[in-house]
């Protein structure tokens, strides 16, 4: 536990020019109510981290979402999840949030409400744990709340459905493929051919080359023009157009991870579009600019708590596994390089992870 005379730490924080930097005088988060203080052992860089620039940057707010670490201190109301000091945990927090500026993953210490924490089994390292949070939280929100897919992991649907995950080699993609298989469904996916074996190892029943001009026809044939659900992990206008074209004649549901194109949505009224923002699963206010602003949502927090409980059971039973990693040296000092590599699209089929400290 940090000494109470120690109230500052090293952390990656926002700057006044819309960028970020490593500071050595950031405050350690205060612990109250159901919050838990965690000594960070590893962090991973996610696409959302690379997008928080300009108006999405709050000066001096701590950045970062995905982390793993050791429980250092429990708030007085953190009594419902069986956590104790010394437990190995991982999850995601909302970094660069004006409504909660002292909390972010890219720091020596972070803090989270107890019910969003995943307990790491002995078989999973801190580095692997740092890849789990935002991917599995976002996938659960997208699949089982936004799309409303029947069944749940540990409670499989009675009738398997063929479901498309566009971008299956992404971290959200591999998480979604596993969750769909555990929910009793038949996941198919698109990715580059060099990632076919990867996505199949995570549960894809079949994989299609998104660059092949015949892929849309192949998927329509594969699904007998009856595809009802599509999760778009790439979330561009072109990926949305692809998903809209392969959803079956009777229509269905489409969910992306970024705001979708209203113009594409107008092309098929029988398809119901939605988009989700993974950090909103915590139910807290996220004070980013529109359209990413989220008010406090207790109903969403309840879903988040229930979903985290499911993930904890899946981890305990070793039914889900982490995304592949690129482990990099340098800790917090090298976060900027990871962000730049993501922006330059230099990373495919792996998540950048930085171990911190000893």
UniProtKB/Swiss-Prot annotation:
The protein's matches in InterPro entries, at most eight in alphabetical order, are given as: ADH-like_C, ADH-like_N, GroES-like_sf, NAD(P)-bd_dom_sf, PKS_ER, Trans-enoyl_RdTase-like
Residues binding NADP(+), per UniProt: 48-51, 169-172, 192-195, 210, 257-258, 347-348
Q: Per the database entry, which stretches of residues form a coiled coil?
A: none
Q: Sorted alphabetically, which keywords does the UniProt record give?
A: NADP, Nucleotide-binding, Oxidoreductase
As recorded in UniProt, its EC number(s) are: 1.-.-.-
Question: What's its top-level EC category?
Answer: oxidoreductase
Highest taxon above the source species = Eukaryota
GO function term, MF aspect, one: oxidoreductase activity, acting on NAD(P)H
Q: Which CDD domains match?
A: enoyl_reductase_like
**Known SUPFAM superfamilies for this protein?**
GroES-like (SSF50129), NAD(P)-binding Rossmann-fold domains (SSF51735)
- Which residues are noted in the entry as substrate-binding? 134-141, 278-282
Pathway listed for it is: Secondary metabolite biosynthesis
| PANTHER family xrefs | HYPOTHETICAL OXIDOREDUCTASE (EUROFUNG), TRANS-ENOYL REDUCTASE STHE
What is the role of the protein in this entry?
A: Trans-enoyl reductase; part of the gene cluster that mediates the biosynthesis of varicidin A, an antifungal natural product containing a cis-octahydrodecalin core. The PKS module of pvhA together with the enoylreductase pvhC catalyze the formation of the polyketide unit which is then conjugated to L-isoleucine by the condensation domain of the NRPS module. Activity of the Dieckmann cyclase domain (RED) of pvhA results in release of an acyclic tetramate. The cytochrome P450 monooxygenase pvhE then catalyzes the oxidation of the C21 methyl group to a to carboxylate group.
Q: What's the family?
A: Belongs to the zinc-containing alcohol dehydrogenase family.
Q: How does it assemble?
A: Monomer.
Q: What is this protein called?
A: Trans-enoyl reductase pvhC
This chain's source organism reads: Talaromyces variabilis
């Amino acid at each position: 536990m940090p000494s109470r005379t120690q109230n500052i730490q090293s952390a990656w924080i926002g700057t006044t020019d819309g960028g970020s930097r490593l500071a050595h005088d950031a405050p350690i988060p205060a612990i109250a109510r159901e919050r838990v203080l965690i000594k960070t052992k590893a962090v991973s860089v996610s696409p959302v981290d690379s997008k928080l620039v300009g108006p999405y940057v709050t000066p001096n707010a701590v950045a970062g979402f995905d982390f793993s670490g050791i429980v250092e201190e429990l708030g007085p109301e953190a009594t419902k999840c069986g956590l104790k000091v010394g437990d190995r945990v991982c999850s995601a927090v909302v970094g660069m949030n004006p409504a909660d500026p002292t909390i972010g993953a890219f720091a020596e210490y972070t803090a989270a409400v107890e019910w969003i924490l995943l307990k790491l089994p002995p078989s999973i390292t801190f580095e692997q744990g740092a890849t789990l949070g935002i991917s599995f939280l976002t996938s659960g929100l997208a699949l089982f709340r936004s799309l409303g897919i029947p069944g749940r992991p540990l409670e499989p649907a009675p009738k398997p459905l063929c479901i498309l995950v566009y971008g299956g080699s992404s971290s959200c993609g591999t998480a979604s493929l596993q969750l769909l298989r555990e929910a009793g469904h038949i996941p198919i996916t698109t990715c580059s051919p060099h990632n076919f074996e990867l996505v199949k190892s995570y549960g894809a029943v079949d994989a299609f080359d998104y660059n092949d001009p015949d892929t849309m026809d192949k998927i329509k044939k594969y699904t007998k023009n009856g595809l009802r659900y599509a999760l778009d992990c790439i979330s561009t206008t072109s990926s949305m157009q692809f998903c809209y074209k392969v959803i079956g004649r009777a229509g269905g549901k489409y969910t992306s991870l970024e705001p979708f194109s209203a113009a594409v949505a107008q092309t098929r009224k029988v398809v119901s579009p939605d988009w989700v923002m993974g950090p909103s699963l915590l139910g807290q206010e996220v004070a980013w600019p529109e359209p990413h602003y989220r008010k406090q949502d207790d109903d969403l927090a309840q879903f988040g708590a229930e979903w985290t409980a499911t993930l904890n059971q899946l981890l305990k039973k070793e039914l889900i596994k982490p995304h592949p990693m690129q482990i990099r040296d340098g800790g917090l000092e090298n976060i900027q390089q990871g962000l730049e590599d993501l922006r330059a699209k230099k990373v495919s089929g792996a998540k950048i992870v930085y171990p911190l400290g000893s």
